[in-house]
Regions:
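C-terminal beta-signal and adjacent terminal beta-strands/loops
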Residues: 32, 543, 686, 697-702, ...
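Gram-negative outer-membrane beta-barrel transporters
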Residues: 82, 95, 481, 489, ...
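N-terminal periplasmic "start-of-domain" segments of outer-membrane beta-barrel proteins
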Residues: 81, 88-93, 99-140, 159-163, ...
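Short acidic/polar hinge/loop motifs at secondary-structure boundaries
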Residues: 185-211
């Protein structure tokens, strides 16, 4: 950590920047709550809301004082508001409608004064229209409407890697280095792997993203931040909904939603079936998802939330294309240039058709959250879930893994005072454990994915336990100092037995037992003297421990063995930001960040085909994130998100066939430099007719360490027209929502994702497996019917 401490001068520079920014803002700051999406409120209305907020806050405090002086038996029952409470484990939902922080109906002792989200963080959330008007294939377009986040196509229809501020950039499949939640239930397994296969866009109300290292809040693997998916409530559905859509390349989707809210219950259940032939050859799939949610208000003090999700996925997987293949035919299955003999195992074969590359995966999560109001100022939350992943994946080798995972956390949140200063306190504890049972077989490359000889069987466990605390002190009116600290101990145990690939006889064993202890401090300063402006500076840290496979190769020889020298990867995030409502119709968010990455875990070739995981000493990422939301007239919304990242290695020697090469000053591969999303949407409420036009731009960036081969830039345009029909005189039909959408309207040829590759020259790099092609022009249409 000494290298990280050495960069403290940046903290002073950012503090000076904060002062300049505050002076420029003429004494106004934005409230911490996620911004309302209705900027049309008049200044008088906003002033009245602020007055009401302050009056209710003072009444609340007087009532608490009066009740605290009574004997317990004489105190009234505490009534908790219906709004969902969320802990730092599950970042709270961002309000997307024009709802005041306090309403006349919220005359309860427990009000929204309780912590709804941490102070001093970069937080953005999608509005419901991002998913409501385009419930088609994936979450990519709606999530990239937020600044700082990039999604890349991976191995499946909804399988995307996620990058935030450069973290997660080298992940070629699934999600790593970023924590994923849905409705407060953790989706990231204990080994740090998340997949978006379970997230169906039609189920979602919004997506929230916390950007920047956040391990003090979300523990292991939160190097880039946190993503929280919010499903629709029963009150949003209010009956039965059916959904159908279809489109290009054989796409078809069917869905049903059932939901209702009563005085004590809110129940919502979703189910969907999706199938497609695919744009790329050998990418056809079908997937089914069920998502069940029950929220139960047990009494005035207690709430319970139950969630069950299951997803079945059967998808073919193409191979990434070389540059030449991509330029010739971007829709080919890939891997034809590799050495393959039908009926014979070859670890270097990547012909997706001969290997019959596929994923047959199932994942189920069942969990619950219990919340109890202990007193007027204290809330206890306890979460527990069971998460099991069962996979069979065929590539050059065939993998069969089962990963049962048990996860739980408990926390206490308290709103109090330190002297006369408001103080919000949080303390939490968590524990989770995952087992992995796996077998690896040869793939005989006969076009059917036939298993050959057993190559390896393995057994592994990971056990994480830790705690954290956080204090947010309003030491001066509208100035909030937040400090937090997290600690986690992780124990990994993995044993693998390897077999000879020719005879199938026992070859060798490899095992590792490692214990890692990590600390994650965080601090921030926020200034928000009004509801329209907010400024903050933040210093936060993240960490991620090695994966099982990282520990089973000797770093000196590359042979099977124990990697005793591998360390957790860590980062330090420094940021300064502002969120400003420059006009009742215009909201702007700007954040600058500087992230130092230490001991990144990478794979290097030691000799021949022998590889091992090592730590790259240090790199840095700096950039700016900009978001704007303008509503000049009723029904019209103009929004945009821009992210710029400049990255480079600070101290890194790369091991190549020619020896060690110093990469200091080189750009970190696969980190985009410029990402821009812009959208213009208009909805004419009297007619129920709306439309939007969206553009996405990605600049070029390097994919290899020597910076000789790059990812091509692109511009993509999408258009959508939708119609909402309300039916008022029928007991069978309530509404119909119809949409037609055209993606990539110009039929641009582009790469949806690249991956980190080796090779010193452009020619050496160009011959590797690099690109997945993005979809050509595609037309989709669909209808949602509200019944009963």
């Amino acid at each position: 950590m000494s290298e990280l401490v050495g960069v403290s001068r940046w903290g002073y520079a950012m503090a000076v920047g904060m002062f300049v920014l505050c002076v420029a803002g003429n004494g106004k700051a934005l409230a911490q709550d996620a911004p309302s999406s209705d900027p049309s409120a008049s200044p008088r209305e906003r002033a009245l809301r602020d007055q009401l907020k302050n009056i209710l806050k003072e009444l609340d405090e007087l009532q608490q004082k009066k009740e605290s002086e009574k004997p317990d038996a004489e105190r009234p029952t505490i009534i908790k508001e219906k709004a969902e409470s969320a802990s730092p484990e599950a970042a709270p939902e961002a309000t997307s409608e024009a709802t005041p922080d306090f309403d006349l109906a919220d005359m309860s002792i427990v009000s929204k004064r309780h912590q709804k989200r941490p102070e001093g963080i970069s937080l953005s959330a999608t509005v419901p229209s991002e998913t409501d008007s385009q419930p088609t294939r994936t979450m990519k377009e709606s999530m990239e409407s937020l600044p700082g986040i990039v999604l890349r196509q991976a191995n499946g229809p909804r399988d995307f890697s996620i990058m935030i501020r450069g973290q997660g950039a080298k992940t070629s499949f699934a999600v790593r280095d970023i924590k994923i939640y849905e409705d407060g239930i953790q989706q990231t397994q204990s080994d740090g792997l998340s997949r978006l296969d379970m997230q169906d866009p039609w189920f979602m109300r919004s997506v929230e993203v916390i950007r920047g290292a956040s391990s003090s809040l979300y523990d292991n693997y939160a190097l880039g931040g946190m993503v929280q998916f919010r499903t629709r409530r029963g009150r949003d559905i209010h009956g039965l909904e059916t959904f159908f859509s279809g489109g290009s390349f054989g796409y078809q989707k069917y869905g049903v939603a059932i939901g209702q809210e009563t005085e004590r219950f809110d129940v919502a259940m979703f189910g969907s079936h999706v199938a497609e032939d695919g744009f790329i050859q050998h990418s056809n799939y079908n997937t089914q998802t069920i998502n069940f949610n029950v929220r139960y208000k047990m009494d005035g003090r207690q709430n319970f939330y139950f969630k069950a999700i299951t997803n079945w996925l059967n998808t073919k997987v193409p191979t990434r294309l070389t540059q030449g293949q991509f330029l010739t035919d971007e829709r080919q299955a890939g891997g034809a240039q590799t050495s393959c003999t039908p009926g014979t195992y070859n670890g270097g074969c990547a012909n997706s058709l001969l290997l019959d590359q596929s994923r047959v995966d199932r994942r189920t999560i069942v969990g619950g959250i219990y919340e109890r109001q202990i007193d007027a100022n204290t809330v206890l939350t306890v979460e527990a879930d069971y998460d099991v992943k069962d996979i069979q994946q065929s590539f050059s080798q065939i993998f069969e893994n089962t990963n049962p995972n048990y996860k739980s956390y408990a926390d206490l949140r308290h709103d109090g005072r330190l002297g006369t200063m408001p103080l919000k306190s949080y303390v939490g504890f968590f524990v989770n454990m995952m087992e992995q049972k796996g077998n690896t077989f040869q793939n005989l490359a006969d076009g059917f994915g036939t298993k050959g000889t057993l190559l390896q069987n393995s057994r592994a466990t990971i056990f994480n336990i830790g705690g954290r605390f956080r204090e947010e002190l309003e030491f001066y009116p509208n100035w909030i100092l937040a400090v937090g600290l997290g600690f986690e101990q992780s124990r990994l145990s993995v044993h693998a037995t390897n077999y000879d690939q020719t005879t199938g006889a026992f070859a060798n064993r490899a095992s590792a037992n490692r214990t890692f202890s990590n600390w994650a401090p965080e601090g921030s300063l926020t200034w928000k003297p009004s509801a329209d402006y907010r400024y903050w500076i933040r210093a936060s840290t993240g960490y991620g421990i090695p994966q099982f496979a990282n520990l089973l190769r000797d770093p000196v020889t590359g042979q099977p063995g124990t990697n005793f020298s591998l360390k957790p990867q860590k980062n330090l995030n420094l940021e300064i930001g502002t969120e400003m409502r420059l006009h009742p119709t215009l909201l702007v968010q700007v954040a600058g960040f500087y992230t130092f990455f230490k001991d990144e875990i990478i794979t290097q070739v030691i000799s021949g085909i022998n590889t091992a995981s090592v730590n790259a000493d240090s790199s840095r990422y700096r950039g700016v994130e900009v978001f704007a939301d303008w509503r000049p007239v009723s029904g019209l919304r103009v929004s945009g998100a821009y992210t710029h990242i400049d990255s480079e290695y600070i101290n890194f020697s790369d091991r190549t066939a020619a020896g060690f090469i110093v990469r200091d000053g080189k750009h970190v591969p696969n980190v985009p430099t410029d990402i821009l999303n812009g959208k213009v949407e208009y909805y004419h409420a009297p007619m129920g007719l709306g439309a939007w036009v969206e553009g996405n731009y990605s600049n070029s960036y390097f994919l290899n360490n020597n910076n000789t081969f790059g990812f091509p830039s692109y511009v993509i345009g999408n258009v959508n027209v939708y119609k909402n029909i309300e039916v008022s005189n029928s007991s069978w039909f309530r509404f119909a929502k119809l949409f037609v959408q055209v993606d990539n309207i110009a039929d641009t040829k582009y790469a949806a994702s690249g991956q980190f590759i080796s090779g010193e020259t452009h020619a050496q790099a160009a011959g590797q497996q690099i690109f997945f092609a993005g979809y050509g022009r595609a037309v989709y249409g669909g209808v949602t019917l509200g019944l009963f």
